[in-house]
């Protein structure tokens, strides 16, 4: 199957009351693991690519060609979107789209509201003309992820969310409602009352960033309140690192990179399968 935009898969998730996982990729093995999990689970999947990860892998075009090649060689039949995570500017989003990304996030949340609307509208106009879906953000998600640093959580304002959606025509919205990038200190406290209000005011799929470490019952409640996309990265990083460390501790003389990285790839696949089942997306690509 060819790459698709996120729009239809997220609208279907919203109607079906489940969420599609965005799992960030960092190299070939991460991409293999996530695609293999999606195919095995018959789940739609979103491959998230941060600007930092794209630079690490060689650039937007390299990433797109790698994903397309793997999808062909692995006989992937489920819907796959390749999504720019936290695009920092119109120019970065345009470069990703021109390289073949099927979805982009423009993160202008650190700008004043009117500037956020202006930049987001510019991205939507360019993206939609090319069949590419757009995610935007309001408020501040705490923690740190690659080039994105949010010192503390600032909740999104529901009325601003409604206005942003109406004025820009975005396909999904990531309102900051208590989640953070990276590990949580203590138990997460998501703003479910605000989430429900934003769902009712906007009517579009909502996105939960910082999905690692949020208890299953909170994940399920978020999905019931319109969250249709959940981002996971830290959990895969931890699983990968744990597997590689265990291998090296067991056999410090190993030097074949495939033997070192392989267990990490397997750990990511197992983690992603668990998340797909938790989010309710398993089996949805077969319907």
UniProtKB/Swiss-Prot annotation:
SUPFAM superfamilies: Aldolase. GO terms for biological process: fructose 1,6-bisphosphate metabolic process; glycolytic process. Gene3D superfamilies: Aldolase class I (3.20.20.70). The modification Phosphothreonine is found at residues 212, 234. Zn(2+) 1 binds at residues 86, 181, 209. PROSITE patterns: ALDOLASE_CLASS_II_1, ALDOLASE_CLASS_II_2. Its EC number is 4.1.2.13. It catalyses: beta-D-fructose 1,6-bisphosphate = D-glyceraldehyde 3-phosphate + dihydroxyacetone phosphate. D-glyceraldehyde 3-phosphate binds at residue 50. Binds 2 Zn(2+) ions per subunit. One is catalytic and the other provides a structural contribution. Pathway: Carbohydrate degradation; glycolysis; D-glyceraldehyde 3-phosphate and glycerone phosphate from D-glucose: step 4/4. It holds the Pfam family F_bP_aldolase. Zn(2+) 2 binds at residues 107, 137. Its cofactor is Zn(2+). The active site is at 85 (proton donor). Keywords: Glycolysis, Lyase, Metal-binding, Phosphoprotein, Zinc. One of its GO terms (molecular function) is zinc ion binding. InterPro entries: Aldolase_TIM (IPR013785), Class_II_FBP_aldolase (IPR050246), FBA_II (IPR000771), Fruc_bis_ald_class-2 (IPR011289). Dihydroxyacetone phosphate binds at residues 182, 210-212, 231-234. Belongs to the class II fructose-bisphosphate aldolase family. Catalyzes the aldol condensation of dihydroxyacetone phosphate (DHAP or glycerone-phosphate) with glyceraldehyde 3-phosphate (G3P) to form fructose 1,6-bisphosphate (FBP) in gluconeogenesis and the reverse reaction in glycolysis. This is Fructose-bisphosphate aldolase. It comes from Geobacillus stearothermophilus.
């Amino acid at each position: 199957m060819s790459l698709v935009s996120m729009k239809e898969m997220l609208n279907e998730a919203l109607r079906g009351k489940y969420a599609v996982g965005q799992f960030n990729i960092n190299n070939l093995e991460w991409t293999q693991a996530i695609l293999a999990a999606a195919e095995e689970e018959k789940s739609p999947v979103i491959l998230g690519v941060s600007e930092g990860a794209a630079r690490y892998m060689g650039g937007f075009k390299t990433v797109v060609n790698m994903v397309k090649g793997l999808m062909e060689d692995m006989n992937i039949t489920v819907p796959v979107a390749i999504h720019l995570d936290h695009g920092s500017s119109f120019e970065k989003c345009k470069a990703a789209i021109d390289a073949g990304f099927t979805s982009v996030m423009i993160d202008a949340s650190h700008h004043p509201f009117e500037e956020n609307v202006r930049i987001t509208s510019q991205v939507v106009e360019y993206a939609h003309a090319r069949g590419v879906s757009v995610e935007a953000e309001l408020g501040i998600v705490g923690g740190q992820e690659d080039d994105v640093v949010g010192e503390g959580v600032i909740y999104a304002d529901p009325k601003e969310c409604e206005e942003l959606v109406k004025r820009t025509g975005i396909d999904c919205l990531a309102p900051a409602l208590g989640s953070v990038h990276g590990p949580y200190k203590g138990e997460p406290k998501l703003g479910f009352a605000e989430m429900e209000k934003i769902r009712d005011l906007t009517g579009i799929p909502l996105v939960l960033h910082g999905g690692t470490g949020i208890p299953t019952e909170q994940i399920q409640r978020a999905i019931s309140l319109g969250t249709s996309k959940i981002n996971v990265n830290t959990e895969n990083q931890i699983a990968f690192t744990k597997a590689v460390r265990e291998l090296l501790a067991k056999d410090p003389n190993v030097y074949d990179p495939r033997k070192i990285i392989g267990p990490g790839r397997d750990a990511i696949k197992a983690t992603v399968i668990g998340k797909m089942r938790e989010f309710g997306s398993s089996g949805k690509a077969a319907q």
